[in-house]
Amino acid sequence: MSHDPQPLGGKIISKPVMIFGPLIVICMLLIVKRLVFGLGSVSDLNGGFPWGVWIAFDLLIGTGFACGGWALAWAVYVFNRGQYHPLVRPALLASLFGYSLGGLSITIDVGRYWNLPYFYIPGHFNVNSVLFETAVCMTIYIGVMALEFAPALFERLGWKVSLQRLNKVMFFIIALGALLPTMHQSSMGSLMISAGYKVHPLWQSYEMLPLFSLLTAFIMGFSIVIFEGSLVQAGLRGNGPDEKSLFVKLTNTISVLLAIFIVLRFGELIYRDKLSLAFAGDFYSVMFWIEVLLMLFPLVVLRVAKLRNDSRMLFLSALSALLGCATWRLTYSLVAFNPGGGYAYFPTWEELLISIGFVAIEICAYIVLIRLLPILPPLKQNDHNRHEASKA
């Protein structure tokens, strides 16, 4: 049996596409409204909160969820764990969508979006800006991911010569793909260092924020591979390739990274004499313990062999790790930020609908492309299974 990726086939306009389609339309209409009538027409952003849910969720959390391709690139190509190679293309596709939509969120969040091209014009570079590094590095990485994913398109179109030429330089492209997120994911942690005391002490750490951001990127990257793979398997009604053994192996890496993060998190609080704030009994201490417990759950569960080999517990553990890291990113960038001056922020329903629409776009585009392009490993060779999968 061939292990080469194959198009899933089946109907393009499936039930999930029909369900999420209206959300995409609403999202697009609201984006047009924002671009034409300004930020105030759809958002609650103000002078104290220059960025909100579009940055905290769509960018910081969204690109964290999109780190699956990057995390697997390190596992497969840097640490030579070739057994994970079947997981690379699905993860890379999700990463490409996640980062692209994260870039779009920046575009709609910036007040004078027509000035964005100045980021890339020599003479206008602000090389001391973390925002500059993040924006330019992300843009380059999106292009790198497009090149990494191009072989799937070339194979589908039968462009053998182009595929051969691309494969000759793929080693360099992969090296860039492994390097670039290491830079901008750590920089995303540096974004709030300049906010100083305006970020609650439980999350403000001038030395550790970049490292915490990088660690959560790796944790989210490996966890999303298990999460998305489990959903695909459920969507194919159990007829997809059996990748559970690979997921179980990934849990070892996730457990180590979670342990490192938690130890460093508490170590920093103890060293800076801030641990008492975690027991203050206020809103921020509750958010802190929610974050910690969400990360402790998979750390405990994944240490028990029986639970680790259970598909449902694998899924729940990956989901818990994702939510824990997402909570940390949301809190340090938005919830724990207090600019003073009486400023307050809460996302409007239009802001939330745009963010929900981004998720809907990614889901629908992912479903469409796995049906058209060789992304997933072959299904189990059974006519009934193929029929069931095509209806998914």
Swiss-Prot record:
<feature type="topological domain" description="Cytoplasmic">
    <location>
        <begin position="229"/>
        <end position="249"/>
    </location>
</feature>
<keyword id="KW-0349">Heme</keyword>
<feature type="topological domain" description="Cytoplasmic">
    <location>
        <begin position="33"/>
        <end position="34"/>
    </location>
</feature>
<keyword id="KW-0408">Iron</keyword>
<dbReference type="GO" id="GO:0019645">
    <property type="term" value="P:anaerobic electron transport chain"/>
</dbReference>
<dbReference type="GO" id="GO:0044569">
    <property type="term" value="C:[Ni-Fe] hydrogenase complex"/>
</dbReference>
<feature type="topological domain" description="Cytoplasmic">
    <location>
        <begin position="155"/>
        <end position="168"/>
    </location>
</feature>
<feature type="topological domain" description="Cytoplasmic">
    <location>
        <begin position="377"/>
        <end position="392"/>
    </location>
</feature>
<feature type="transmembrane region" description="Helical">
    <location>
        <begin position="282"/>
        <end position="302"/>
    </location>
</feature>
<feature type="transmembrane region" description="Helical">
    <location>
        <begin position="334"/>
        <end position="354"/>
    </location>
</feature>
<comment type="similarity">
    <text>Belongs to the NrfD family.</text>
</comment>
<feature type="topological domain" description="Cytoplasmic">
    <location>
        <begin position="80"/>
        <end position="90"/>
    </location>
</feature>
<dbReference type="InterPro" id="IPR051817">
    <property type="entry name" value="FDH_cytochrome_b556_subunit"/>
</dbReference>
<feature type="transmembrane region" description="Helical">
    <location>
        <begin position="35"/>
        <end position="55"/>
    </location>
</feature>
<feature type="transmembrane region" description="Helical">
    <location>
        <begin position="356"/>
        <end position="376"/>
    </location>
</feature>
<feature type="transmembrane region" description="Helical">
    <location>
        <begin position="59"/>
        <end position="79"/>
    </location>
</feature>
<keyword id="KW-0249">Electron transport</keyword>
<feature type="transmembrane region" description="Helical">
    <location>
        <begin position="91"/>
        <end position="111"/>
    </location>
</feature>
<dbReference type="GO" id="GO:0046872">
    <property type="term" value="F:metal ion binding"/>
</dbReference>
<keyword id="KW-0997">Cell inner membrane</keyword>
<keyword id="KW-0479">Metal-binding</keyword>
<feature type="transmembrane region" description="Helical">
    <location>
        <begin position="208"/>
        <end position="228"/>
    </location>
</feature>
<keyword id="KW-1133">Transmembrane helix</keyword>
<feature type="topological domain" description="Periplasmic">
    <location>
        <begin position="271"/>
        <end position="281"/>
    </location>
</feature>
<feature type="transmembrane region" description="Helical">
    <location>
        <begin position="12"/>
        <end position="32"/>
    </location>
</feature>
<dbReference type="GO" id="GO:0009061">
    <property type="term" value="P:anaerobic respiration"/>
</dbReference>
<dbReference type="InterPro" id="IPR005614">
    <property type="entry name" value="NrfD-like"/>
</dbReference>
<feature type="transmembrane region" description="Helical">
    <location>
        <begin position="134"/>
        <end position="154"/>
    </location>
</feature>
<feature type="topological domain" description="Periplasmic">
    <location>
        <begin position="112"/>
        <end position="133"/>
    </location>
</feature>
<dbReference type="Pfam" id="PF03916">
    <property type="entry name" value="NrfD"/>
</dbReference>
<feature type="topological domain" description="Periplasmic">
    <location>
        <position position="355"/>
    </location>
</feature>
<dbReference type="GO" id="GO:0005886">
    <property type="term" value="C:plasma membrane"/>
</dbReference>
<keyword id="KW-0812">Transmembrane</keyword>
<keyword id="KW-0813">Transport</keyword>
<feature type="topological domain" description="Periplasmic">
    <location>
        <begin position="56"/>
        <end position="58"/>
    </location>
</feature>
<feature type="topological domain" description="Cytoplasmic">
    <location>
        <begin position="303"/>
        <end position="333"/>
    </location>
</feature>
<comment type="function">
    <text>Probable b-type cytochrome.</text>
</comment>
<keyword id="KW-1003">Cell membrane</keyword>
<feature type="transmembrane region" description="Helical">
    <location>
        <begin position="250"/>
        <end position="270"/>
    </location>
</feature>
<feature type="topological domain" description="Periplasmic">
    <location>
        <begin position="1"/>
        <end position="11"/>
    </location>
</feature>
<keyword id="KW-0472">Membrane</keyword>
<feature type="topological domain" description="Periplasmic">
    <location>
        <begin position="190"/>
        <end position="207"/>
    </location>
</feature>
